[in-house]
């Protein structure tokens, strides 16, 4: 990813999306937490796990948190303390993830590269973040998207049900990890346009990929590179895929089954290493 060559300029500002998408989020209902981001995983609120991970990564300079609502902060004293101390900059969330991301970006200097992730990434580790960003920095692109192979998830977590994008060159699972240079920020605006069409799926597919790419997908000929090239052409942003080796990168906590899996993975790691070190 093309950024200024000076090492200091290669530290990223992180934007974390932390708002509930619905008033009936299954994780919130199951755990009784004030919001999804506060739901405990391994006894620690998900949002605190993510913030701890970003703090431990030497490629992250600042953290901006979009949501949850300020009225809920008393329900997570550790988060409230970090906001009050200036460790984290909090912003009210907007009415959609893309608009929240856009608001977060507006508070970051244009010459600062950005990492975008989510508060429900409970298994995120400093090593995953570092690997993603280091790979992104070596690529000739404006935006990088993290992914793991469907096979890696199936092998590591048998029975785990994940949404896998199946293309000619394999199955892919997104990781909710995105990196942008200044030019790459335009991808968030493209994302917002796609969100506005979410109730019109075929028009959405046509706008995001284009007719030729859709035909290739239908006939099983679409590869990841062709898909990214189609999105790059439509958005005007040069996008590249960063394949990550750690299958935990593809596990976010959206459903109760995800929560149980994350708890099991954390328990397995603690038991095998005698430590909760997330590296």
Which residue stretches match the model-derived regions?
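Short catalytic helix/loop segments, enriched in acidic residues and glycine
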Residues: 31-49
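Short, acidic, metal-binding catalytic loop of nucleotide-sugar glycosyltransferases
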Residues: 53-60
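A conserved acidic beta->alpha catalytic loop
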Residues: 67-73
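Short phosphate-binding loop-to-helix
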Residues: 78-113, 123-124
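Active-site acidic Asp-centered loop
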Residues: 117-119
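Conserved core of the sugar-phosphate nucleotidyltransferase
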Residues: 124-233, 244-248
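Short, conserved phosphate/pyrophosphate- and ester-handling motifs at nucleotide-, phospho-/glycolipid
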Residues: 255
């Amino acid at each position: 990813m093309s950024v200024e060559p000076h090492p200091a300029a290669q530290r990223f500002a992180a934007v974390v999306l932390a708002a509930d998408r619905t008033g009936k989020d299954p994780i919130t209902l199951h755990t009784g937490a004030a919001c999804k981001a506060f739901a405990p995983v391994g006894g620690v609120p998900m949002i605190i796990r993510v913030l701890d991970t970003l703090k431990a990564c030497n490629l992250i300079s600042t953290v901006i948190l979009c949501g949850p609502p300020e009225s809920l902060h008393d329900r997570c004293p550790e988060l409230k303390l970090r906001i009050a101390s200036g460790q984290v900059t909090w912003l009210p969330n907007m009415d959609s993830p893309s608009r929240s991301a856009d608001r977060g970006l507006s508070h970051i200097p244009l010459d600062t590269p950005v990492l975008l992730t989510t508060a429900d990434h409970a298994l995120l580790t400093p090593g995953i973040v570092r690997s993603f960003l280091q790979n992104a920095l070596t690529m000739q692109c404006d935006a990088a998207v993290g992914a793991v192979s469907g096979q890696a998830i199936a092998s590591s977590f048998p029975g785990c049900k994940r949404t896998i994008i199946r293309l000619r060159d394999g199955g892919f699972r997104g990781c909710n990890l995105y990196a942008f240079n200044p030019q790459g920020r335009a991808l968030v605006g493209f994302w917002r346009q796609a969100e506005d069409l979410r109730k019109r799926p075929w028009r959405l597919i046509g706008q995001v990929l284009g007719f030729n790419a859709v035909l290739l997908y239908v006939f099983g000929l679409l590869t990841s590179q062709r898909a990214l090239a189609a999105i790059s052409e439509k958005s005007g942003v040069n996008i590249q895929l960063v394949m990550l080796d750690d299958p935990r990168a593809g596990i976010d906590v959206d459903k109760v089954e995800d929560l149980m899996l994350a708890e099991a993975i954390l328990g397995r790691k603690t038991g095998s290493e005698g430590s909760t070190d997330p590296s």
